[in-house]
Structure formats: structure tokens, C-alpha cells
Amino acid sequence: MAHEFLHLVWHPGWGLSSQSLMLIWPRRLLVAVYYEGFMPRTRWLVMRLSPLVGLTVLPTLVLLVIYPCEVSFFWQQFIVLVILVNSLGAGGDLVASVIVARQVASGGQVGNWNGRAYWRAEKAIGSEAA
């Protein structure tokens, strides 16, 4: 749930837009977020990678910093569990980010429209406004 929340807050409108949806499907043990529309490539990359940074990289750094201090075994193991579970869940985010970083120009936009993922170049964005 925290993983998806970190995606959600990086949607345009900080996840409060009518274009942002959170899907909770208990029967399939699925929690997901979806944004119907486009966002700049950089924002999309930040949105995709924020759970990896927030729930894997930062907790790892915290463990390294507090390691010499007296921290209970329970909390150390809890943080390690969060890191491991999130690392597995963020694998798809990492792959998608590499694909977008390689294929979409820096001025482009990435998004979903009618349930399908698309990207569009900067020139296409400018021609729509005209």
C-alpha cells in the first residue's frame, strides 16, 4: 500500500485529480494506481522510481547509519523485510523506467489513454496546442 501511495503522490495534482485512480482488489491481493492522461517524461520517471527510492534505497541508508547504534533486532529485521519485499515489487517499475528513459525523448510525455500506455514526442505536444 505504501508502494502505491508513493506512486500516487507523484501523479499530476498529487494524486487528488479525477484522473488518478487507486484500485484495491482483495480477491487478487492487488493494489494499484492508474493515471488516465499524460505527464512529462521526467515526472513519470520520478513517479515510477519513488517507491524504489523511498522504500528500498532510503531504508538501506538508514540501516547503514544506525547500524553502530543500539537498535532492537525486531526493527532491524522489519526494515530488512520492507527492503526485500519492496525490491521485488519495484522490479517492474525499474524495467519500465529503463525502457522509457531509453526510448522517450527528454521533452516527451508518457501516459495512459483508454487503458493503454503511450508516449508522445515534444513536437506532437506543440502541434496539439496550435
Q: Where are these predicted regions, by residue range?
A:
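Small-residue-rich helix-interface/hinge motifs
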Residues: E4-F38
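Metalloprotease/metallohydrolase-associated module, dominated by Zn2+-dependent proteases
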Residues: R27-E122, A130
